[in-house]
């Protein structure tokens, strides 16, 4: 591959590598992820420096991974231990959204030709005709990002002897799902830290996009949003449809809770200048397995909930309050409806009550233990049965098993957290290099603005999901314990290396590729900025971070 790159400009190298990577399918949770990492490994090994120093590029197997996925690392050792980590994920979402054009999803030229005559979206057509945009699955998210890191790896390897600090590169799978690549990478990062590397910062280049149609600002993020997955198991009281008003219908309860939480802007954190999204329902299901005329017994749902400064405890407290309020409103409504129906038909008063408890997973365990019930024995059995299966379904199975253990079969709404959990992080001025990173970023952006006429804005939090969330942890031990106590069998189902994340402690800066329509069939990356401006910005900022004295170029 090096022979195809060596006589080309930086921009040409970046585009050529992007096209090469887009052409290889690497859908999350498929063997294609491993094939792409192997291709990247092969590309790196073709670079002259790594021909002479093969020990500085290596593959890391992801222990216990069902798809046998791997990470690839490359290191350029500098004159001092100060180190910058460049990281990029190589997986993509699948291509079902392309419909009949699925065969073209990995062919940028064919897609550009198609969109050049496309009448369904005038902007897409205009941009295809301009030649400034490269189309294809992963072109934006984020094969172009991996390509730019490869381009910079090549160029930095060509000036390796003059590097003040160490440059470390990671290309990993599984960002779009469970972050297995980055979580495995923590072990390597800790190993190298123990061997003497001193991490200053990490640079991710996950994609950025316009906030609105007139927006051409390029956003730089000095931290990353976190995420929790608050989950609800609703256990009701079944009834024949001929006696429906005496039921406690879990679908009704779930629907009302969903209405109060889903896309509710009142639940959004107020952070000046930051792009903060509301909670979103990702899963909603009642638990009937076949048709009959009995109302459902239980229902389940979970929400994507971004956190910026909030902790898991804050989210739990908020949602408990919303749920209790909703359940009380439903109690009043249901009892009123029952009385109206009874009076309308001339039935005598009854002692029927609509009562639903609201509790956390921790509360439920404590209640059952206080009754002398074998909580741990049941959890051990269910965790063993669900080992290696979907972690969210496993979590629901554990909660359901505890509910079934209750001899009273009390109707309940049980609130808990399911995997994954992404810590939020941000550039902390108290961190050893915090002030230095911010000052050097400002200066570098001033230089690039003068050279390119680009407009930049710095934000505290990358507002979407990113691997960089796992590189540091700001929650206190008490705050983490709320998560641990309310994520069913976290140590078995989702053994998150909390202590390792806290130990590695690398601030992650996102300086992303730029384009439109990530995860859509019209996905495309903007070449003039991404291939011409961004590589130099990232490379020079990294050199700034490890420089022994202030750089003037």
Residue ranges with predicted function:
Residues 150-158, 256-263, 539-543:
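Short glycine/serine- and small hydrophobic-enriched flexible loop segments
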Residues 190-392, 396:
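Midchain, well-structured core segments that form catalytic/ion-binding scaffolds
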Residues 2-137, 158, 162-165:
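Acidic/His- and Gly-rich active-site-bordering loop/insert found
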Residues 92, 232-239, 307, 512-520:
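A glycine-centered beta->alpha junction motif in the catalytic cores
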Residues 160-162, 221-227, 291-297, 405-408, ...:
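Short glycine/proline-enriched loop/turn "hinge" motifs that connect secondary-structure elements
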Residues 133-223:
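Acidic/histidine-rich catalytic neighborhood of metal-dependent amide-processing enzymes
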Residues 31, 134-147, 244-251, 528-532:
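Short, conserved micro-motifs enriched in small and acidic residues
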Residues 36-37, 55, 339-553:
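An extended, acidic, His-containing surface patch that forms the Zn2+-binding/catalytic region
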């Amino acid at each position: 591959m090096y022979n195809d790159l060596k006589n080309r400009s930086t921009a040409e190298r970046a585009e050529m590598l992007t096209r090469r990577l887009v052409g290889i399918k690497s859908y999350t949770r498929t063997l294609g992820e491993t094939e792409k990492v192997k291709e990247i490994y092969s590309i790196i090994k073709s670079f002259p420096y790594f021909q002479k120093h093969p020990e500085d590029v290596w593959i890391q197997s992801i222990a216990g991974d069902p798809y046998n996925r791997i990470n690839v690392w490359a290191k350029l050792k500098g004159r001092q231990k100060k180190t910058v980590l460049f990281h990029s994920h190589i997986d993509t979402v699948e291509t079902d959204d392309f419909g009949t054009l699925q065969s073209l999803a990995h062919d940028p030229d064919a897609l550009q030709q198609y969109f050049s005559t496309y009448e369904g979206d005038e902007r897409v057509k205009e941009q295809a005709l301009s030649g400034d945009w490269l189309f294809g699955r992963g072109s934006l998210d984020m094969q172009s990002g991996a390509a730019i890191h490869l381009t910079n790896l090549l160029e930095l390897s060509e000036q390796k002897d003059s590097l003040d600090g160490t440059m470390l590169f990671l290309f990993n799978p599984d960002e779009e799902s469970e972050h297995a690549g980055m979580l495995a990478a923590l072990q390597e990062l800790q190993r190298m830290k123990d061997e003497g590397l001193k991490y200053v910062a990490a640079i991710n280049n996950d994609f950025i996009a316009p906030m609105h149609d007139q927006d051409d600002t390029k956003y730089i993020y000095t931290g990353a949003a976190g995420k929790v997955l608050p989950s609800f198991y609703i256990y009701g009281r079944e009834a024949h449809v001929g006696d429906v008003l005496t039921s406690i219908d879990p679908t009704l309860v779930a629907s009302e809770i969903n209405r109060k939480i889903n896309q509710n802007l009142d639940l959004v954190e107020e952070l000046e200048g930051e792009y903060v999204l509301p909670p979103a329902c990702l899963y909603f299901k009642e638990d009937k397995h076949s048709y009959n005329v009995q109302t459902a017994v239980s229902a389940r749902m979970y929400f994507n909930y971004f956190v910026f400064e909030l902790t898991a405890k804050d989210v739990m407290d908020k949602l408990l309050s919303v749920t209790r309020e909703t359940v009380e409103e439903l109690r009043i409504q249901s009892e009123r409806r029952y009385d109206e129906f009874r009076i309308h038909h001339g039935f005598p008063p009854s002692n029927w009550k609509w009562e639903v408890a609201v509790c956390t997973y921790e509360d439920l365990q404590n209640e059952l233990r206080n009754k002398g019930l074998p909580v741990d024995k049941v959890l051990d059995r269910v965790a063993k049965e669900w080992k290696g299966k979907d972690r969210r379904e496993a979590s629901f199975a554990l909660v359901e098993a505890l509910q079934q253990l209750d001899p009273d079969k009390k109707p309940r709404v049980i609130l808990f957290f399911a995997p994954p959990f992404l810590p939020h992080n941000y550039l902390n001025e108290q961190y050893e290099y915090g002030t230095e990173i911010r000052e050097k970023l400002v200066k570098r952006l001033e230089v690039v603005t003068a050279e390119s006429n680009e407009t930049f804005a710095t934000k505290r939090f990358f507002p979407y999901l990113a691997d960089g969330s796992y590189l540091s942890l700001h929650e206190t031990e008490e705050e983490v314990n709320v998560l641990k106590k309310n994520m069913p069998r976290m140590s078995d189902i989702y053994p998150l290396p909390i202590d390792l994340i806290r130990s590695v402690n690398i601030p992650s800066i996102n300086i992303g590729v730029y384009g439109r329509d990530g995860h859509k069939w019209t996905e495309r990356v903007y070449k003039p900025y991404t291939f011409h401006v961004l590589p130099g910005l990232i490379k020079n900022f990294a050199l700034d971070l490890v420089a022994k004295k202030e750089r003037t170029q």
